[in-house]
């Protein structure tokens, strides 16, 4: 017969007391929520009480989300990356961090995605640290007025619509009018100037981006450029944040007393991506189904392009950089539909920027490239940044072209024209021809100055319109071979005085006497 074990009540209470004494609680303070719905790259979570707007939310498998909608009993977040590993019922936890991307000189020459991860197969990036993608734009006190030029190397822009360092100049036009070509030429022309460039491709085909990267490499411009890509196959979330990521990478150089140029190609696709996200988050739609804060989407991005004064640079670098101003120049691109610049997003961006370069389909199709409509294009602050030679010689060009366009339309109906009108029309035709320029062939300040000098002083009046491009090319070759010192002097100082005028006059007359074009 088995022996029964009898326990005293006092022993039971002793055992319980021991267990209570030995019991320890290891707690981890975590703000966790549960996924209640997951579709179209948007996740809704219940239980994240302390989440902040714009905070990163971590999901299982290292996937992150961005909290955008904070509602009473749920949080709407957009997933950055692959959502196929997530499922309803899984947990998401707050990280206490906002979205950051790598910054630094190690990114130059690289192609990265919207989160700063390399996608060019050249190995890991040695960054100088991380920086948040959303920042407050420089205040009025910390800014400095724009007074230095960004040379694009395109005669039509540098003479008529000059861009200054720290300016925001919009490039606007229909599809296939050469918007990207202008921006890429501007990046290529910064080679050797010390200006760092960032090219942000939003919603473009991978093949288009690959061909742009190849062109930059061919012209030796990739080494001073960061390419940020959120392609057409990427999620709307990445297309929405890519411009902010690129801006942060460009700001790194501005805050260290250097000059940077950023191209957003294009902000129309970013607006589409943001509209998609907003509608999926069930935000109330407004005009053209865009959310109410679509203006703020672009204004908070473009206001970060600025020129900051030396005191601010010294403060931001903790006294390491003294006496240097920094700048970030923005060239946002907007695509219009059938030339409609009065649509919602184009009018928003026109009102935010400091001027626009308007590209015309009809001009493009008639062979005028770059197809810049000088009547609708304007630069509101760039004039103060122009070099003396460009200001002096290019001043009359814009007016002459505007008058020519007006007269050209009128002359179609008039049978007999007086001599003054005919001369003006002929001069306009010559200026139009002279403003044409091949892609990937930017000119120096001196070369542009020579071209403007010959048209301003009437040296083209006896040159047939169809020979102007060969005349200009031969003149540049002649100047480079026999008057290199003069070109160098103009490039160095950008000055224009009686002495330079006399030298240019002598050189052009010598060239015309050779008749070698």
Swiss-Prot record:
Q: Which reactions fall under this protein's catalytic activity?
A: ATP + H2O + 4 H(+)(in) = ADP + phosphate + 5 H(+)(out)
How the protein sits in the membrane?
Answer: Peripheral membrane protein
Kindly list the positions annotated as binding ATP: 173-180
Principal localisation? membrane
Which EC class does it fall in? translocase
Record localization: Cell inner membrane
Protein name, please? Answer: ATP synthase subunit alpha
Q: What is the lineage of its organism?
A: Bacteria, Pseudomonadati, Pseudomonadota, Gammaproteobacteria, Legionellales
């Amino acid at each position: 017969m088995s022996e029964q074990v009898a326990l005293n009540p006092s022993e039971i209470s002793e055992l319980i007391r021991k267990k209570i004494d030995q019991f320890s609680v290891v707690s981890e303070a975590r703000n966790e929520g549960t996924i209640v719905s997951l579709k179209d790259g948007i996740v809704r979570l219940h239980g994240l009480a302390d989440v902040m707007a714009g905070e990163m939310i971590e999901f299982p498998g290292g996937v992150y989300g961005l909290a955008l909608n904070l509602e009473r009993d749920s949080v709407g977040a957009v997933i950055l990356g692959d959502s196929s590993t997530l499922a309803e019922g899984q947990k998401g936890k707050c990280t206490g961090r906002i979205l950051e991307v790598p910054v630094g000189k190690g990114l130059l020459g690289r192609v990265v995605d919207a989160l700063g991860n390399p996608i060019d197969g050249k190995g890991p990036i040695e960054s100088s640290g991380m920086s948040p993608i959303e920042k407050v734009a420089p205040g009025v006190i910390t800014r400095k007025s724009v007074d230095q030029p960004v040379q694009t190397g395109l005669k039509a822009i540098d003479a008529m619509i000059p861009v200054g360092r720290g300016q925001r100049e919009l490039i606007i036009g229909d599809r296939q009018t050469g918007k990207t070509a202008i921006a890429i030429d501007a990046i290529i022309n910064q080679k050797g100037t010390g200006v760092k460039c960032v090219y942000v491709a939003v919603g473009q085909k991978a093949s288009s981006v690959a061909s742009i990267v190849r062109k930059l490499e061919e012209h030796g411009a990739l080494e001073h450029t960061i390419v940020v890509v959120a392609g057409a196959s990427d999620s709307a979330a990445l297309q929405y944040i890519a411009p902010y990521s690129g801006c942060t990478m460009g700001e790194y150089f501005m805050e260290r007393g250097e000059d940077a140029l950023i191209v957003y190609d294009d902000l129309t696709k970013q607006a589409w991506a943001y509209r998609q996200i907003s509608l999926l988050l069930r935000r109330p739609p407004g005009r053209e189904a865009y959310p109410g804060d679509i203006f703020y989407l672009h204004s908070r991005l473009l206001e970060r392009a600025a020129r900051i004064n030396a005191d601010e640079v010294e403060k931001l670098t903790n006294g390491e950089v003294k006496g240097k101003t920094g700048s970030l120049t923005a060239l946002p691109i907007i695509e219009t539909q059938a030339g409609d610049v009065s649509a919602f997003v184009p009018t928003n961006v026109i009102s935010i920027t400091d001027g626009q370069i308007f590209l015309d389909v009809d001009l493009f199709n008639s062979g005028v490239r770059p197809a810049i409509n000088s009547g609708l294009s304007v630069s509101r602050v760039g004039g103060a940044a122009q070099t003396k030679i460009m200001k002096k010689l290019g001043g009359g060009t814009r007016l002459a072209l505007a008058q020519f366009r007006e007269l050209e339309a009128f002359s179609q109906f008039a049978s007999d024209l007086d001599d003054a009108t005919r001369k003006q029309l002929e001069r306009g035709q010559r200026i139009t021809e002279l403003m044409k320029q091949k892609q990937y062939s930017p000119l120096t300040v001196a070369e542009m100055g020579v071209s403007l000098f010959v048209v301003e002083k009437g040296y083209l009046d006896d040159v047939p319109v169809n020979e102007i491009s060969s005349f200009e090319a031969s003149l540049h070759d002649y100047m480079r071979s026999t008057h290199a010192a003069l070109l160098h002097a103009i490039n160095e100082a950008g000055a224009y005085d009686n002495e330079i005028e006399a030298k240019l006059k002598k050189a052009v007359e010598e060239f015309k006497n050779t008749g070698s074009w």
